[in-house]
A protein has these predicted regions:
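Short coil-to-beta strand junction motifs in C2/discoidin
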Residues: 153-161, 271-276
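Disordered, acidic Ser/Thr/Pro-rich linker "stalks" and the adjacent N-terminal cap
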Residues: 2, 30-140, 183, 194-230
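Surface-exposed loop/edge segments in extracytoplasmic proteins
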Residues: 117, 169-178
């Protein structure tokens, strides 16, 4: 057991270090002076300030698509214990049974003691030879993303990758965001633990930090978007990092499964114990409004479709407040910063 189980101290340190990184990024992407609820300091709206929507889990209740989900047809799976034994705790996945189904949308639903749900892929008994599994989440609009955290019910993958799209254009190519692997160079042709250079801050890194088979359940995979980026403390003046955190859709590729090596013997119950299962996906961030809105709301388009948009202030317009209103183009549009709200000015 000692071969594959991390020490308790190491697990606690990883959790603690993640919380420290997360706290730093929340303070950085937010406003240290608390100016996020209003776009003006005064009731007369004469003192504009940078404003932002509240920090949220951008993935919550968003639709998820997967190329591989158990239950069609119903299939049996077994709980991984780490011990090869002819007797395993097994049950069924059945997409037509509300109590036995595990669809992809279960990774973004509400989680509590009364709603212990998860998504699950087919087992190695069905997905054999193994083919990578993909999950895609459409956020519905661009967000400034601070972190992504995935909590697994199964052992974490040996290799997985996160990709993103910046815009809502479905034809936009996927951009690599982060790689996780015990074999970074072999699997992704990326050297592990690289240092980001100031000249290229939009580069996906690879780490083996979350690729151990232990714990067998409840393990997290976490990624903070600005960690290790040279200009992370000068975000207002870094267009490269502003684009790097901008995310409208996320793709998770589960490329290699962690096993104990016993699958090579072909035992059916052993193969039934290997699959991917995710309890929860959290995408921490703010609705992207470029510092010109304190809220985002769904608006109905003439077509009847609902669209998430910023409620723009400072005489700005657009889904992300990314432009000036007509007749307010006395100077070029600009993002609001902590020091300057960069209000669009009238020509008259």
């Amino acid at each position: 057991m000692e071969v594959y189980c991390c020490s308790r101290a190491k697990r606690h340190w990883r959790r603690f270090s993640f919380l420290l990184r997360l706290l730093a990024l929340l303070m950085f992407l937010g406003t240290a002076d608390g100016q996020t609820r209003s776009c003006y300091r005064d009731r007369d709206r004469k003192l504009p300030v940078r404003c932002m929507p509240e920090f949220e889990n951008a993935a919550y209740s968003k639709p998820v698509e997967s190329n591989n989900t158990c239950g069609i047809p119903p299939s049996e799976f077994c709980v991984q214990t780490g011990v090869t034994s002819p007797t395993k705790e097994c049950t069924f996945c059945n997409a037509s049974d509300p109590l036995l189904r595990h669809p992809a949308d279960y990774i973004t639903d509400i989680k509590n003691d009364q709603n212990r749900t998860w998504w699950q892929s087919e087992t190695l008994l069905v997905n054999n030879p193994f083919k990578p599994v993909t999950l895609t989440i459409d956020l519905g609009k661009s967000y400034d993303v601070s972190y992504i955290r995935i909590r697994f019910r199964s052992p974490r993958p040996e290799s997985m990758a996160i990709y993103k799209r910046t815009s809502t254009d479905p034809k936009e190519p996927w951009t690599p965001y982060q790689y996780f692997s015990d074999s970074c160079k072999k699997t992704y042709n990326v050297e592990p633990m690289q240092i980001v250079s100031p000249e290229n801050q939009q580069v996906a890194l690879c780490t083996d930090e979350f690729s151990s088979i232990s714990p067998l359940t409840g393990g997290n995979v976490a990624f903070t978007t600005l960690e290790g980026r040279p200009d992370n403390l000068n975000f207002d003046n870094s267009p490269a990092l502003q684009e790097w955190v901008t995310t409208s859709a996320i793709r998770i590729d589960l490329d290699k499964m962690n096993t104990f090596g016993d699958e090579v013997f072909g035992d059916a119950n052993v193969l039934r114990s290997y699959y991917f299962a995710i309890i929860d996906l959290a995408v921490g961030g703010r609705c992207k409004c470029n510092g010109h809105a304190a809220n985002c709301e769904k608006k109905q388009l003439p077509s009847g479709k609902m669209e998430l948009r910023c409620i723009c202030q400072h005489n700005t317009a657009g889904v992300d407040c990314q432009e000036c209103k007509p007749l307010y183009n006395d100077r070029p549009w600009a993002r609001a910063t902590k020091d300057n709200a960069n209000v669009c000015r009238s020509k008259f």
